[in-house]
């Protein structure tokens, strides 16, 4: 599930057999934890009453929904699960999720209340000018030059970047066909990350204002578009508070600040209260790298954490 287009170099006996495809983000570990938890639930179901649930006396098979969700790495599978009404169908009242995290000590559970991960969106800027020979540059409208100006202007708008952290970076720019002609078209591609929707909307609005100013100044046409992307991951305070208590002996850690990466778990949190957590691998090997791996013993911590979460 969610294999990435990377050739694995771990040398593990369970390494991918498919060239150019590997589990490099821990999603295989996420599945293994849920499968292990499912086995525990299955073992409990015939106990009378189930010892895990003696205090509340409910059948775990009607009160625990395990979601094996694909496509986090692509289109955001959580979005489609929500749109198809899965949470409503099973009367989900709260939701929890883990992600293996190499930058935290082995088996440590880490999370925080409030903003935890960023909203992400792809930004596209199209600039239409007019071509001319470089010796008659005054007859053209230089889309390449305007594109460079646009990037510089956007990068230098501190009034748009308030105290709430945000990242706006352009990583790709295409323009022109030949070296001695004024470019008539430029395309710029980038990414925007914000921890709240208000900051995101503000930055998009300011980019459109800059586009309008340049349209008037250069007689060009600039179009700024963006994808819907993933919402920000924002953890419920009550669930965080309870989790921090029940995980105290498992090596719990409260994160000091949010991360600017994104995860589609945020779609679930738009429907019901949720808590997203990291489970440390302690390896320091980055996600999405060819040598990403983890000690499988940490999965036992994840399974135990899920067991305890059913008591919340």
How would you describe each model-predicted region?
Residues 3-6, 12-22, 28-29, 44, ...:
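Histidine/acidic-residue-rich, glycine-tolerant segments that coordinate divalent metal ions
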Residues 31-38:
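DPxDG-like acidic metal-binding loop motif
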Residues 144-312:
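Metal-dependent amide/peptide-bond hydrolase catalytic core
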Residues 38-45, 269-271:
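Alpha-helix C-terminal capping segments
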Residues 40, 84-85, 213-214:
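A generic secondary-structure signal
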Residues 10, 33, 77-78, 139, ...:
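Residues at alpha-helix caps and immediate loop-helix transition turns in enzyme cores, especially N-
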């Amino acid at each position: 599930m969610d294999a990435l287009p990377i050739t694995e170099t771990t040398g593990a006996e369970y390494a991918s057999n498919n060239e150019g495809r590997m589990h490099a983000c821990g999603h295989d570990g996420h599945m293994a934890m849920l499968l292990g938890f499912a086995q525990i639930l299955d073992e409990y179901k015939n106990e009378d009453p189930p010892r895990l649930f003696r205090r509340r006396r409910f059948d775990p098979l009607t009160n625990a929904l395990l979601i094996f969700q694909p496509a986090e790495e692509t289109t955001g599978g959580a979005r489609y699960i929500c749109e198809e009404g899965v949470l409503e169908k099973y009367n989900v009242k709260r939701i929890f999720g883990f992600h293996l995290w190499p930058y935290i000590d082995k088996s440590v559970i880490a999370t925080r209340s409030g903003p935890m991960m960023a909203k992400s969106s792809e930004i596209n800027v199209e600039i239409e000018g007019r071509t001319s020979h470089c010796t008659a540059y005054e007859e053209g409208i230089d889309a390449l030059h305007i594109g460079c100006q646009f990037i510089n202007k956007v990068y230098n708008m501190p009034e748009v970047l308030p105290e709430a952290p945000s990242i706006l970076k352009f990583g790709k720019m295409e323009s022109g066909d030949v070296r001695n002609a004024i470019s008539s078209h430029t395309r710029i591609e980038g990414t925007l990350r914000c921890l709240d929707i208000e900051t995101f909307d503000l930055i998009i609005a300011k980019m459109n204002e800059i586009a309008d100013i340049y349209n008037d100044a250069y007689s060009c046409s600039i179009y700024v578009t963006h994808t819907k992307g993933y919402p920000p991951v924002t953890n419920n305070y009550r669930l965080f508070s309870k989790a921090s208590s029940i995980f105290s002996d498992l090596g719990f850690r409260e994160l000091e600040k949010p991360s600017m990466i994104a995860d589609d778990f945020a779609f679930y949190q738009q429907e019901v209260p949720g808590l997203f957590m990291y489970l440390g691998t302690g390896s320091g090997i980055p996600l999405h790298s060819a040598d990403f791996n983890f000690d499988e013993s940490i999965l036992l911590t994840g399974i135990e954490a899920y067991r305890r979460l059913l008591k919340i």
